[in-house]
Amino acid sequence: MDQDDQRAFREFVGARMASLRSLAYVTCGDWHAAEDAVANALIKLYARWRRVDRPDLYAQTMVYRAAVDETRRSWWRRERPAGDAMPDVESADPAGVSDERIRVRQALMAVPPGQRAVLFLRYYQGLTIEEAADVLGCHPGTVKSQAARGLARLRERLKDLSESDELEEHADACV
């Protein structure tokens, strides 16, 4: 790889690292496994850099598949840490995280991984249905149905979390 290609690759990775890490985390639910998945995907991308026509979609596809592979490992299933908290990408200060943001994260982690990946690609990454289907290696209809089911599950979970907060507030007021 010549210097121009190396520079282009470094710029690409620098601009998209947070997004790729988030995709991997949303897919596998563990930051350590997500880091491994991103690293493995970027190694493969680096080796194929000159031949890749659409590096954004290629990188997202590779990261998604690597994250899925990480979740399939038997050691992952046995040693998954309980309650692995999702750190705030924009701010490392946990005090700056709002209650609403925490509620949304909790609700999102309750959505099944496939639906969570679709929601992330469609609504956080802003991919079209076809682009998300390419990344996930499925049909556009699958993306549509998974997005609809994922949004319904997310709404249901957010409603449940909201109602439990209202009950806690009511109980606090009665004391």
Question: What function would you assign to each model-found segment?
Answer:
Residues M1-E11, R21-N40, R48-D53, P140:
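Short, charged helix-capping/linker segments at alpha-helix termini
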Residues A8, A152-V175:
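C-terminal edge and immediately downstream basic/flexible tail or linker adjoining helix-turn-helix-like DNA-binding
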Residues E11, R103-P112:
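Short amphipathic alpha-helical boundary/capping segments
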Residues M17, R21, L42, P112, ...:
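C-terminal flanking helix
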Residues A47, R54, T61-G83, G96-V97, ...:
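Arg/Lys-rich amphipathic alpha helix in sigma70-family domain 2
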Residues R54, V68, L136-D160:
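DNA-recognition helix of helix-turn-helix
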Residues D69, R77-R101, T128, L167-C174:
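Internal acidic/polar
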Residues V118-R122:
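A short pre-motif secondary-structure segment
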